[in-house]
């Protein structure tokens, strides 16, 4: 467990405060988990973003009438902190009985508080239900590897030695799997996700990728660190010209988390999958 997470509200009984309470936000420094992967804030081998989507966003108009919407938050992957998910939920719940004179006032408040917690500017979009409904759900790009016939026996810890590639062949391809699962390091609750690997480099053995991804099944870590570990293990093996790894997780507590990591600048969309 991350030492800072022990002091977070995650896994504890909490009072749900219904009026504006930014002190609910609990930042967790990324540095400890980066150190486990052998990287520092100065040597990050990726660019990217963590998209958070909130489906329980509500506040009051000056008339007292409530409004509901969907929040989209973009936290830079190089921000000093992640925001612990239950604290994020408690903070958003604190807006439920809070009056905002305009949508702009609400958005400015969210940007200020979330940026302060993350330690870097956080992008905020407040979207109408009609807008999100019209967008619908999308399928992941590339080839799904979940139908491959593989024998699997390890579920406890990620095992990069399972990965194999053809060093004599360079390919450019996109692969995806819906079989990513890990566990919350604090509560032990399951985190279900779908993962995409886009790369140009040594030809990755698809079956080995599937067995590797399933090896996360009982692993305890936060969403962001799981994606960073996958990214680094593939980068070390494939020596790619470019590599992008991203995962879209099933929501819990009204929030879903979607980390993106890439060798270069990316402009990811934030479109929902069928399980989101």
Swiss-Prot record:
GO cellular component: cytoplasm
Binding residue positions for substrate: 83-85, 223-224
Keyword terms, alphabetized: Cytoplasm, NADP, Oxidoreductase, Queuosine biosynthesis
Reactions listed under catalytic activity: 7-aminomethyl-7-carbaguanine + 2 NADP(+) = 7-cyano-7-deazaguanine + 2 NADPH + 3 H(+)
Family annotation (SUPFAM superfamilies): Tetrahydrobiopterin biosynthesis enzymes-like (SSF55620)
Assembly information from the UniProt record: Homodimer.
Protein name listed in UniProt: NADPH-dependent 7-cyano-7-deazaguanine reductase
Originating species: Pseudomonas putida (strain GB-1)
Organismal lineage: Bacteria, Pseudomonadati, Pseudomonadota, Gammaproteobacteria, Pseudomonadales
